[in-house]
């Protein structure tokens, strides 16, 4: 049923009054938004994870949480997202609350260190205020806070060792996210919170794992990624990296509960070529016969490691295979990104 002329006139007057009071664009019809309906994304550096996320990466203008055990690849993944944003002409910032940033490893992950903004704040309040100022500048594309557990309230730092201050960090995070959420959406910045796991005492049923910082981040995050190391990669007796599995625990922009697996190598971060071989083989773009890999009728090499080195030395061919994978996989992500089994063993409960 069409809107009557009287209602249309009253609605137009109300919208005009809202625009005058709160600024142009405060309210609008979705049909007039046009091209802005599509969700923009920044790639993660792993094509498997881009597919699992459903939109080709992490969404702009949203809060992202990456959590997992120690040495599982949380910071590596965040640094690859910064590197991808820089390749697109964007600006990245790294708020190092843990005071453990390694510029050499970040460069190996593809981050342009000379253009990266780095801050090592003294308190949690300072870290979140710096984040807010960067967001409101509308000039930064990716902001990484490493980590939520290291955002220590000022009162705790100034107090004595052993002082009990329950809930203070949770209140800090809740207040900060209330202030930040609207500004993040308007700025189109991706704000990534890296979080750690803790164990809950006395849990008899379900997972005893919990993330730090209270409940607020769980609600404000549009995407929550659970990253775990599932295998140690070795060359002979020497460990050269890890194979990790990422589960999309929450996703507001595409179907959740998908998962992705990829290699993280000590000397380069996420192995782009290894990821392309795995996904290309699953989709049938790369054909495997015995130990040999083929692209069409062209032989790529014998053994996965040899093919990985071949693709690394032939970036144009790698780009072409990646283009074919994205064209095929992003139209049907569920065909390549299986759903994760989210049960008691995998669920993470927040404090």
UniProtKB/Swiss-Prot annotation:
UniProt cross-references to Pfam families, sorted A to Z: RecA, RecA_C
Subcellular location: Cytoplasm
GO MF annotations in UniProt: ATP binding; ATP hydrolysis activity; ATP-dependent DNA damage sensor activity; damaged DNA binding; single-stranded DNA binding
Biological role stated in the UniProt entry: Can catalyze the hydrolysis of ATP in the presence of single-stranded DNA, the ATP-dependent uptake of single-stranded DNA by duplex DNA, and the ATP-dependent hybridization of homologous single-stranded DNAs. It interacts with LexA causing its activation and leading to its autocatalytic cleavage.
Keywords: ATP-binding, Cytoplasm, DNA damage, DNA recombination, DNA repair, DNA-binding, Nucleotide-binding, SOS response
Naturally occurring in which organism (per UniProt): Chloroflexus aggregans (strain MD-66 / DSM 9485)
HAMAP family: RecA (MF_00268)
InterPro entries recorded: AAA+_ATPase, DNA_recomb/repair_RecA, DNA_recomb/repair_RecA_CS, P-loop_NTPase, RecA-like_C, RecA-like_N, RecA_ATP-bd, RecA_C_sf
Protein name: Protein RecA
């Amino acid at each position: 049923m069409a809107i009557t002329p009287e209602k249309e006139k009253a609605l137009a007057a109300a919208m005009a009054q809202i625009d005058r009071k709160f600024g142009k664009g405060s309210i609008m019809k979705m049909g007039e938004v046009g091209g802005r309906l599509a969700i923009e994304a920044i790639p993660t550096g792993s094509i498997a994870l881009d597919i699992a996320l459903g939109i080709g990466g992490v969404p702009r203008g949203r809060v992202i949480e990456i959590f997992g055990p120690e040495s599982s690849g949380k910071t590596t993944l965040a640094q690859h997202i910064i590197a991808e944003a820089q390749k697109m002409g964007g600006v990245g910032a790294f708020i190092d609350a843990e005071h453990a940033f390694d510029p050499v490893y970040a460069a190996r992950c593809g981050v342009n260190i000379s253009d990266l903004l780095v801050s090592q704040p003294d308190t949690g309040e300072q870290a979140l205020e710096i984040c807010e100022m960067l967001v409101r500048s509308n000039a930064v594309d990716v902001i990484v806070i490493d980590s939520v557990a290291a955002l220590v309230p000022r009162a705790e730092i100034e107090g004595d060792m052993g002082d009990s201050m329950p809930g203070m960090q949770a209140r800090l995070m809740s207040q900060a996210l209330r202030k930040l959420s609207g500004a993040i959406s308007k700025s189109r910045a991706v704000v990534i919170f890296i979080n750690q796991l803790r164990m809950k005492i006395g849990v008899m049923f379900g997972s005893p794992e919990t993330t730090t910082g209270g409940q607020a981040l769980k609600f404000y995050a549009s995407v929550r990624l659970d990253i775990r190391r599932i295998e140690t990669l070795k060359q002979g007796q020497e460990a050269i990296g890890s194979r990790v599995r990422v589960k999309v625990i929450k996703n507001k922009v595409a179907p959740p509960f998908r998962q992705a697996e990829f290699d993280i190598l000590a000397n380069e971060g996420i192995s782009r070529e290894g990821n392309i071989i795995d996904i290309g083989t699953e989709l049938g773009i790369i054909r495997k016969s015995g130990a040999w890999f083929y692209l069409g009728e062209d032989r790529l090499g014998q053994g996965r490691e040899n093919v990985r080195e071949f693709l690394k030395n032939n970036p144009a061919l790698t780009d072409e295979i990646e283009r074919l994978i994205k064209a095929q996989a992003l139209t049907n992500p569920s065909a390549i990104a299986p759903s994760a089994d989210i049960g008691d063993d995998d669920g993470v409960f927040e404090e």
